Amino acid sequence: MSYSQLVWFKKDLRIKDHSPLYQATKNGKCLCLFVYEDEIINSDDFDTRHFNFLNQSLIDLRKKLRQLGSNLIIRRGECVEVLRKLHNEHPFETIWAHQETGNWISYQRDLRVLSWAKETGIQYKEFYQNGVIRKLNTRDGWSRIWNQRMNEKIIPTSSSIHSPNNIDYGEILSPSNFDLNTTSNSKGLLGGETHAKQCLETFLSDRGKNYQKEMSSPVTAFDSCSRMSSYLTFGNISIKEVYQTSKERADQIRLNKSKSNPEDKGWLKSLSSFQSRLRWHCHFIQKLEDEPEIEHQNINKAYDGLREESFNSEYYEAWLKGQTGYPIIDACMRALKDGGWINFRMRAMLVSFTSYHLWLHWKKPAIELARLFTDYEPGIHYSQIQMQAGVTGINTVRIYSPIKQVTDQDPQGIFIKSYLPELNSVPDHHLAEPHKMTQLEQSMYGCVIGKNYPHPIVNHAEAYRSARDRIHSIKKMKSTKEESKKVFLKHGSRKSNRRPVRS
């Protein structure tokens, strides 16, 4: 009996810099498999926008595999059952796959597949594809290993792939096959390796020149940010390739640097900032890799019980619908529903607002934001959610002012008015707090508060003071500081300018 190799595609939907694919093709005929998993697609953190981006990625991957003489086998079901059936039909001796740090469901899935492979006598070979280190003993030296990995050679693409004959390759499924909302039509980027490379090229050749200066404002971030996050989430391109390509661009600028071109200095600063964020990308995923429970539990147990005692559903629904009475909050929520992306500072502000102003526990907003973010990456998501909610004990407590963010990031209301047309006639100086307009002004500008646009659901100053006092009362406790030391040892950055937690 002839045995094949099996490449199990998960969130690594590309052919370049793909160690499992490259190694498998060197060992004989190769089966390339992707599984639509009902338990993942039906989970609370999955949305049609993810499905659409996934399908676009699969279409592109299948096309590229066909060009190499192979094809992508597509199946639906529970992974172990799919693998068992496929193995009976077309025996394979080795499963080749990338390590994945996903949500709890995918974590348990991986354990089941590994167990089945051992029981069946099938070799299971996993490869890392980023800077996340499995079975990490200490954070000391983590950055050094990350740098080593990012500077390794790009894995070449096989010139051809030999696959067994007489296989039912299956079809790409639609949202309706899973009872997903088929009317959800995100205006975000298109998925796939081809689009990933195009997006990176436009960022490094033009869009990224003011990245460092323009990443914080939603007015400029949509163009000036790299927009590579979704492509990294679905593995349409490796983080190593992104990092090395950005370094090559920086080297090119240094080589051709001209004193008469002030843009060169800005470019180098922007590329340096971008590269540091690629490292942070893996830094945060490492937290979930080391402690999968943070998807459901506070990183710092000293904060258990902080917000669990109540959950104001009216506040939550207003935030969800973009009807809080704070324009920058509402515009961001509507932008997310429209396109599935918003820049980091605005994400942090949204979580800060729910956690402090509305005093909501982070779990339910985290699930909703996961559904809204096309680039939802569980490791980054839950680490950042807890950081912005103030329950890590090792990060600075930041309570973003939704008023100050307007004056700092969108003083002319360019972003706000594009998503809140009811405020189109409101003058710039009233945009941060339209409820402070007089009745006459409200009539003049066609924006009656309580009719055309809601009253603020909470008082900013009062909510700020209350949240600050409550969070700091816990943070300064001796027991909290002791717990925070443990959190820092397990998860804290070892950057030289980072202060350790002190008693």
Annotate each language-model stretch with its function.
Residues 227-429:
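Active-site-proximal binding-pocket segments
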Residues 1-275, 285, 392-503:
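Active-site "lid/cap" and pocket-lining segments within catalytic core domains
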